Amino acid sequence: MFETSSEKPAPVRVVTEAIKEYLDRLGPIWIEGEISELNERSGGMAFIRLRDTSADMSLSVMCYKTVLASVQPLPPNARVVIHAKASWYTKSGTLTMSAKEIRQVGVGELLA
């Protein structure tokens, strides 16, 4: 990592590149949550809002519809584990989670 101060701040490019390097080293991870939103788009992509099962936190995950098809049909608020890889786009400072596998583990407790 690098050291910064008000006298020696890090340029945006250095910070965004450091975030990208860290996330690239992290590799794919398994994430558990409840699907609170599911939007299937034309073009083969789907976007999932994954909500924590015990805290008021959520995360956006994108996947190909073929990945989603392996667990269809999903009941409302399905509880799932998702194998995903985080990617950081340095130009825009955007974090994207891309699902490679989804497994249903039960029906969640989220009430709409």
Q: Each predicted region: which residue ranges?
A:
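Acidic, two-metal ion nucleic-acid-processing modules in DNA metabolism proteins
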Residues: 1-112
